[in-house]
Protein backbone atom coordinates (compact mmCIF):
# COMPACT_ATOMS: atom_id res chain seq x y z
CA UNK A 1 0.00 0.00 0.00
CA UNK A 2 1.44 3.37 -1.01
CA UNK A 3 1.98 6.03 1.64
CA UNK A 4 -0.14 8.93 0.36
CA UNK A 5 1.96 11.46 2.27
CA UNK A 6 4.83 10.74 -0.13
CA UNK A 7 5.09 12.30 -3.59
CA UNK A 8 4.25 9.71 -6.26
CA UNK A 9 5.90 10.02 -9.68
CA UNK A 10 5.13 7.73 -12.63
CA UNK A 11 7.79 7.12 -15.27
CA UNK A 12 8.32 4.68 -18.11
CA UNK A 13 9.75 1.38 -16.91
CA UNK A 14 11.59 0.66 -20.14
CA UNK A 15 11.65 2.21 -23.57
CA UNK A 16 12.40 5.48 -25.29
CA UNK A 17 12.06 7.79 -22.26
CA UNK A 18 13.21 5.48 -19.47
CA UNK A 19 16.94 6.22 -19.39
CA UNK A 20 16.52 9.98 -19.78
CA UNK A 21 13.85 10.10 -17.05
CA UNK A 22 16.12 8.15 -14.71
CA UNK A 23 19.04 10.47 -15.43
CA UNK A 24 16.91 13.59 -14.88
CA UNK A 25 15.72 12.39 -11.47
CA UNK A 26 19.28 11.45 -10.47
CA UNK A 27 20.65 14.85 -11.50
CA UNK A 28 17.90 16.48 -9.45
CA UNK A 29 19.46 14.79 -6.42
CA UNK A 30 16.90 12.01 -5.95
CA UNK A 31 18.79 8.98 -4.63
CA UNK A 32 16.92 5.92 -5.75
CA UNK A 33 17.74 2.38 -6.87
CA UNK A 34 16.07 1.84 -10.23
CA UNK A 35 18.20 -1.14 -11.21
CA UNK A 36 15.92 -3.79 -9.75
CA UNK A 37 12.88 -4.85 -11.76
CA UNK A 38 10.31 -3.56 -9.30
CA UNK A 39 7.11 -1.65 -10.00
CA UNK A 40 7.74 0.78 -7.13
CA UNK A 41 11.08 2.26 -6.05
CA UNK A 42 11.54 4.44 -2.98
CA UNK A 43 13.84 7.47 -2.76
CA UNK A 44 16.40 7.27 0.04
CA UNK A 45 16.71 10.99 0.71
CA UNK A 46 13.28 12.44 -0.12
CA UNK A 47 9.65 11.40 0.52
CA UNK A 48 9.23 10.27 -3.11
CA UNK A 49 7.97 7.01 -4.61
CA UNK A 50 8.65 6.17 -8.27
CA UNK A 51 6.11 4.01 -10.11
CA UNK A 52 7.67 2.32 -13.15
CA UNK A 53 4.93 1.51 -15.63
CA UNK A 54 4.13 1.33 -19.36
CA UNK A 55 4.22 4.74 -20.99
CA UNK A 56 0.61 4.60 -22.18
CA UNK A 57 -0.54 3.98 -18.58
CA UNK A 58 1.05 7.18 -17.25
CA UNK A 59 -1.49 9.77 -18.49
CA UNK A 60 -4.36 7.78 -16.98
CA UNK A 61 -2.59 7.39 -13.64
CA UNK A 62 -2.17 11.17 -13.46
CA UNK A 63 -5.65 12.04 -14.76
CA UNK A 64 -7.24 9.57 -12.31
CA UNK A 65 -5.23 10.95 -9.38
CA UNK A 66 -3.38 7.69 -8.67
CA UNK A 67 -0.02 9.49 -8.87
CA UNK A 68 0.92 13.12 -8.36
CA UNK A 69 3.34 13.59 -11.26
CA UNK A 70 4.17 11.82 -14.50
CA UNK A 71 7.01 12.01 -17.02
CA UNK A 72 5.49 11.22 -20.39
CA UNK A 73 5.80 11.90 -24.12
CA UNK A 74 3.42 14.56 -25.38
CA UNK A 75 2.29 12.19 -28.15
CA UNK A 76 1.10 9.57 -25.63
CA UNK A 77 -0.46 12.24 -23.43
CA UNK A 78 -2.39 13.85 -26.30
CA UNK A 79 -3.59 10.48 -27.60
CA UNK A 80 -5.01 9.56 -24.18
CA UNK A 81 -6.56 13.01 -23.80
CA UNK A 82 -8.35 12.67 -27.15
CA UNK A 83 -9.38 9.11 -26.31
CA UNK A 84 -11.02 10.16 -23.05
CA UNK A 85 -12.77 13.12 -24.62
CA UNK A 86 -14.14 10.81 -27.31
CA UNK A 87 -15.68 8.74 -24.49
CA UNK A 88 -17.36 11.81 -23.02
CA UNK A 89 -14.91 12.31 -20.16
CA UNK A 90 -13.38 15.61 -19.08
CA UNK A 91 -9.78 14.66 -18.18
CA UNK A 92 -7.87 17.17 -16.08
CA UNK A 93 -4.17 17.64 -15.39
CA UNK A 94 -1.50 20.36 -15.46
CA UNK A 95 1.56 20.45 -17.69
CA UNK A 96 4.32 21.73 -15.41
CA UNK A 97 7.05 21.95 -18.03
CA UNK A 98 8.34 20.59 -21.31
CA UNK A 99 11.55 18.61 -20.91
CA UNK A 100 14.65 18.55 -23.10
CA UNK A 101 14.54 14.93 -24.22
CA UNK A 102 12.26 12.44 -25.94
CA UNK A 103 11.98 14.43 -29.16
CA UNK A 104 10.13 12.61 -31.95
CA UNK A 105 7.56 13.17 -34.67
CA UNK A 106 4.40 11.34 -35.63
CA UNK A 107 4.31 11.04 -39.40
CA UNK A 108 2.36 9.62 -42.28
CA UNK A 109 4.32 7.24 -44.52
CA UNK A 110 3.49 5.56 -47.82
CA UNK A 111 5.10 2.92 -50.05
CA UNK A 112 8.07 4.25 -52.01
CA UNK A 113 6.45 3.52 -55.36
CA UNK A 114 3.29 5.55 -54.66
CA UNK A 115 2.89 9.27 -55.37
CA UNK A 116 1.90 11.64 -52.59
CA UNK A 117 0.32 14.97 -53.51
CA UNK A 118 -1.11 15.87 -50.12
CA UNK A 119 -3.39 14.49 -47.39
CA UNK A 120 -6.30 14.40 -49.83
CA UNK A 121 -4.73 11.47 -51.67
CA UNK A 122 -5.39 9.39 -48.54
CA UNK A 123 -9.16 9.74 -49.00
CA UNK A 124 -10.85 6.43 -48.06
CA UNK A 125 -7.46 4.72 -47.65
CA UNK A 126 -6.75 2.26 -44.84
CA UNK A 127 -4.07 3.63 -42.49
CA UNK A 128 -2.31 1.54 -39.83
CA UNK A 129 -1.40 3.33 -36.61
CA UNK A 130 -1.01 3.12 -32.84
CA UNK A 131 -2.34 6.68 -32.56
CA UNK A 132 -5.86 6.59 -34.03
CA UNK A 133 -7.11 9.72 -32.27
CA UNK A 134 -4.16 11.93 -33.25
CA UNK A 135 -4.47 10.64 -36.81
CA UNK A 136 -8.22 11.32 -36.89
CA UNK A 137 -7.75 14.81 -35.45
CA UNK A 138 -5.25 15.66 -38.19
CA UNK A 139 -7.21 14.21 -41.12
CA UNK A 140 -10.51 15.66 -39.86
CA UNK A 141 -8.90 19.09 -40.10
CA UNK A 142 -8.00 18.26 -43.70
CA UNK A 143 -11.54 16.95 -44.40
CA UNK A 144 -10.13 13.54 -45.30
CA UNK A 145 -12.07 10.34 -44.53
CA UNK A 146 -10.05 7.18 -43.90
CA UNK A 147 -10.27 3.67 -42.46
CA UNK A 148 -8.22 3.03 -39.34
CA UNK A 149 -6.20 -0.15 -38.80
CA UNK A 150 -5.18 -0.20 -35.13
CA UNK A 151 -1.84 -1.89 -34.41
CA UNK A 152 0.14 -1.75 -31.16
CA UNK A 153 3.48 -2.63 -32.69
CA UNK A 154 5.34 -3.25 -35.96
CA UNK A 155 3.13 -0.70 -37.70
CA UNK A 156 5.67 -0.28 -40.49
CA UNK A 157 5.06 -3.81 -41.85
CA UNK A 158 1.33 -3.20 -42.42
CA UNK A 159 1.48 -2.08 -46.10
CA UNK A 160 3.81 -4.92 -47.08
CA UNK A 161 1.54 -7.40 -45.27
CA UNK A 162 -1.50 -6.05 -47.11
CA UNK A 163 -3.11 -4.72 -43.93
CA UNK A 164 -3.06 -1.05 -44.89
CA UNK A 165 -2.33 1.40 -47.70
CA UNK A 166 -0.28 3.74 -45.50
CA UNK A 167 0.86 4.11 -41.90
CA UNK A 168 1.02 6.78 -39.21
CA UNK A 169 3.86 6.10 -36.79
CA UNK A 170 6.68 7.65 -34.79
CA UNK A 171 9.77 8.49 -36.84
CA UNK A 172 13.29 9.38 -35.77
CA UNK A 173 15.77 8.78 -38.60
CA UNK A 174 13.47 7.17 -41.17
CA UNK A 175 15.74 4.13 -41.50
CA UNK A 176 13.03 1.71 -40.34
CA UNK A 177 10.59 3.14 -42.87
CA UNK A 178 13.10 2.78 -45.70
CA UNK A 179 13.89 -0.80 -44.67
CA UNK A 180 10.19 -1.59 -45.08
CA UNK A 181 9.80 0.13 -48.44
CA UNK A 182 8.15 3.27 -47.04
CA UNK A 183 8.86 7.00 -47.09
CA UNK A 184 7.78 9.76 -44.75
CA UNK A 185 5.33 12.10 -46.47
CA UNK A 186 3.77 14.28 -43.76
CA UNK A 187 4.56 15.20 -40.14
CA UNK A 188 1.31 15.44 -38.19
CA UNK A 189 2.59 15.93 -34.62
CA UNK A 190 5.89 16.86 -32.96
CA UNK A 191 6.52 15.69 -29.43
CA UNK A 192 8.90 15.90 -26.49
CA UNK A 193 8.76 14.54 -22.97
CA UNK A 194 6.89 16.63 -20.44
CA UNK A 195 6.18 16.67 -16.70
CA UNK A 196 2.51 16.65 -15.76
CA UNK A 197 0.69 17.01 -12.43
CA UNK A 198 -2.68 15.68 -11.32
CA UNK A 199 -5.61 18.02 -10.88
CA UNK A 200 -6.99 18.82 -7.45
CA UNK A 201 -5.70 20.18 -4.19
CA UNK A 202 -2.13 19.25 -3.33
CA UNK A 203 -0.99 19.08 0.33
CA UNK A 204 1.38 21.95 1.17
CA UNK A 205 4.31 19.62 1.89
CA UNK A 206 3.94 17.90 -1.48
CA UNK A 207 3.59 21.20 -3.33
CA UNK A 208 6.76 22.51 -1.70
CA UNK A 209 8.59 19.36 -2.83
CA UNK A 210 7.20 19.75 -6.37
CA UNK A 211 8.36 23.37 -6.46
CA UNK A 212 11.82 22.26 -5.31
CA UNK A 213 11.98 19.59 -8.02
CA UNK A 214 10.89 22.09 -10.68
CA UNK A 215 13.67 24.47 -9.63
CA UNK A 216 16.20 21.66 -9.80
CA UNK A 217 14.92 20.46 -13.17
CA UNK A 218 15.24 23.98 -14.51
CA UNK A 219 18.83 24.03 -13.27
CA UNK A 220 19.62 20.65 -14.83
CA UNK A 221 18.09 21.56 -18.19
CA UNK A 222 19.70 25.00 -18.23
CA UNK A 223 23.07 23.46 -17.38
CA UNK A 224 22.75 20.99 -20.26
CA UNK A 225 21.96 23.85 -22.62
CA UNK A 226 24.82 26.04 -21.36
CA UNK A 227 28.60 25.95 -21.48
CA UNK A 228 31.27 27.54 -19.33
CA UNK A 229 33.75 29.36 -21.56
CA UNK A 230 37.25 30.48 -20.65
CA UNK A 231 39.65 32.26 -22.99
CA UNK A 232 42.38 34.87 -23.26
CA UNK A 233 41.62 37.89 -25.43
CA UNK A 234 43.24 41.20 -26.48
CA UNK A 235 42.02 44.00 -24.20
CA UNK A 236 41.14 46.29 -27.11
CA UNK A 237 38.90 43.68 -28.77
CA UNK A 238 36.78 42.62 -25.80
CA UNK A 239 33.45 43.84 -27.17
CA UNK A 240 34.05 42.10 -30.51
CA UNK A 241 34.78 38.86 -28.69
CA UNK A 242 31.69 39.19 -26.48
CA UNK A 243 29.49 39.88 -29.53
CA UNK A 244 30.39 36.44 -30.91
CA UNK A 245 28.87 34.74 -27.86
CA UNK A 246 25.10 35.33 -28.07
CA UNK A 247 23.23 34.33 -24.98
CA UNK A 248 26.22 34.92 -22.74
CA UNK A 249 25.98 37.09 -19.65
CA UNK A 250 28.53 39.84 -19.23
CA UNK A 251 31.81 38.03 -18.65
CA UNK A 252 34.16 38.07 -15.70
CA UNK A 253 37.36 39.84 -16.76
CA UNK A 254 40.62 38.95 -15.01
CA UNK A 255 44.11 40.40 -15.57
CA UNK A 256 46.86 38.15 -16.89
CA UNK A 257 50.09 38.11 -14.90
CA UNK A 258 52.85 39.93 -16.77
CA UNK A 259 50.68 40.85 -19.79
CA UNK A 260 48.70 44.10 -19.69
CA UNK A 261 47.59 43.81 -23.32
CA UNK A 262 45.48 40.71 -22.74
CA UNK A 263 42.88 39.55 -20.22
CA UNK A 264 41.26 36.30 -19.18
CA UNK A 265 37.51 36.02 -19.80
CA UNK A 266 35.17 33.63 -18.01
CA UNK A 267 31.47 33.40 -18.94
CA UNK A 268 28.42 31.17 -19.14
CA UNK A 269 26.91 30.88 -22.60
CA UNK A 270 23.42 29.56 -23.18
CA UNK A 271 24.23 28.92 -26.84
CA UNK A 272 26.07 26.01 -28.41
CA UNK A 273 29.58 27.09 -29.30
CA UNK A 274 30.34 25.73 -32.76
CA UNK A 275 33.77 25.29 -34.30
CA UNK A 276 33.06 28.21 -36.64
CA UNK A 277 32.55 30.53 -33.67
CA UNK A 278 35.75 29.32 -32.03
CA UNK A 279 37.63 29.99 -35.28
CA UNK A 280 36.21 33.53 -35.40
CA UNK A 281 37.28 34.07 -31.78
CA UNK A 282 40.77 32.93 -32.69
CA UNK A 283 40.84 35.33 -35.67
CA UNK A 284 40.18 38.18 -33.21
CA UNK A 285 43.26 37.18 -31.25
CA UNK A 286 41.63 34.96 -28.63
CA UNK A 287 43.67 32.02 -27.39
CA UNK A 288 43.50 29.19 -24.84
CA UNK A 289 39.78 28.80 -25.61
CA UNK A 290 38.14 26.24 -23.33
CA UNK A 291 34.48 25.17 -23.55
CA UNK A 292 33.36 23.11 -20.56
CA UNK A 293 30.08 21.35 -19.67
CA UNK A 294 28.14 22.52 -16.62
CA UNK A 295 26.78 19.88 -14.25
CA UNK A 296 24.42 22.03 -12.18
CA UNK A 297 23.23 25.62 -12.44
CA UNK A 298 21.00 27.93 -10.41
CA UNK A 299 20.36 31.57 -11.18
Swiss-Prot record:
Its cofactor is Mg(2+). Feedback inhibited by histidine. SUPFAM superfamilies: GlnB-like (SSF54913), Periplasmic binding protein-like II (SSF53850). One of its GO terms (biological process) is L-histidine biosynthetic process. Keywords: Amino-acid biosynthesis, ATP-binding, Cytoplasm, Glycosyltransferase, Histidine biosynthesis, Magnesium, Metal-binding, Nucleotide-binding, Transferase. GO terms for molecular function: ATP binding; ATP phosphoribosyltransferase activity; magnesium ion binding. Pathway: Amino-acid biosynthesis; L-histidine biosynthesis; L-histidine from 5-phospho-alpha-D-ribose 1-diphosphate: step 1/9. The keyword Transferase applies. One of its GO terms (cellular component) is cytoplasm. Its EC number is 2.4.2.17. It catalyses: 1-(5-phospho-beta-D-ribosyl)-ATP + diphosphate = 5-phospho-alpha-D-ribose 1-diphosphate + ATP. It is found in: Cytoplasm. It holds the Pfam family HisG. Equilibrium between an active dimeric form, an inactive hexameric form and higher aggregates. Interconversion between the various forms is largely reversible and is influenced by the natural substrates and inhibitors of the enzyme. Belongs to the ATP phosphoribosyltransferase family. Long subfamily. Catalyzes the condensation of ATP and 5-phosphoribose 1-diphosphate to form N'-(5'-phosphoribosyl)-ATP (PR-ATP). Has a crucial role in the pathway because the rate of histidine biosynthesis seems to be controlled primarily by regulation of HisG enzymatic activity. This is ATP phosphoribosyltransferase.
Amino acid sequence: MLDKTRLRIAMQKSGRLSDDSRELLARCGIKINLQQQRLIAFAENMPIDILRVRDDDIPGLVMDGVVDLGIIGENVLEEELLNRRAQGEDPRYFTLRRLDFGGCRLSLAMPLDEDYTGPECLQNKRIATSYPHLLKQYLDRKSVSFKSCLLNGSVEVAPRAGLADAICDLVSTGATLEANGLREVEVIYRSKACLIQRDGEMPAEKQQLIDKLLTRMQGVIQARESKYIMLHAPSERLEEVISLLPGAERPTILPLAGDQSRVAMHMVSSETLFWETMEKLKSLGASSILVLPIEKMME
